Amino acid sequence: IASYNERFRNIQNVVLDAMQTLPYFCYLIPVLMFFGGGIVSAVLATVIYSIPPIIRLTSLGLTQVSGSYSEVSRSFGGTLLQTLGKVKFPLAVPSLVIGFNQTVILAFAMQIVTPLIGGKGLGLEVFNGLARSDTGRGLAAGIAIVLLAVIIDRITLAWTKKQRIALGLISKNK
C-alpha cells in the first residue's frame, strides 16, 4: 500500500521511525503484560522489534521500481496483483533481501534480552553466563550468536549481489 499511497507511506514511516528508536527493553514490557512470560512472549517481542526494516525496505524497493514496468504490465492486461507479483516484486528482490538481512540481524540482537521474559536458546546461555559470572559460557554463546549473524549476513549479501547482476543493476566486476 505504501508504494502506491504517499500519505500511507508517510504515516508508515513515522510509525517505523518510532519503533526503531525505542530501546529493545521497551518491547518487553507490553508483551510481558499481555502475554506473560515464556517462549511465545519472547518470539513476539523479537518479531515486533525486528520487523521495521523489512517493512521499510519492501516499501522502498517497490517504490524505486520504475513506473514504466508497471505501465507495460498494465498495457498487457496485468492486474494490480499480477503487476506486484510478477513485475514489481522480482525487480525489488535486492531491497527485499537487504530488509530480510536487517530483520535477521535485529532478531539475533534481541535474543540477548529475551531470557528476561522467558526466552530460550543462545540468549539464555549468554544471560546465564552473565548471571553466574561464568565468562566462558557467556562468551561462547555470544560468539555463536555473532557467527550465526555474520554467516546469514554474508549468505544474503552474496545472493543479493547475484540478483543485482541478474537484473543488470551492477556489473560482474563490482
Where on the chain are the PLM-derived regions?
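Generic hydrophobic transmembrane alpha-helix motif, especially the helices
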Residues: 5, 12-50
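Hydrophobic/aromatic residues within the transmembrane alpha-helices of Major Facilitator Superfamily
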Residues: 22, 35, 47-51, 58-62, ...
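Short cytoplasmic-facing helical segments at TM-TM junctions of multi-pass membrane proteins
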Residues: 11, 53-96, 126
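Residues that define the loop-to-transmembrane-helix transition and helix capping
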Residues: 7-10, 39-40, 70, 81, ...
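Glycine-rich helix-loop "coupling/hinge" segments at transmembrane-helix boundaries
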Residues: 33, 107-148, 164-173
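Transmembrane alpha-helices
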Residues: 44, 48, 80-114, 136, ...
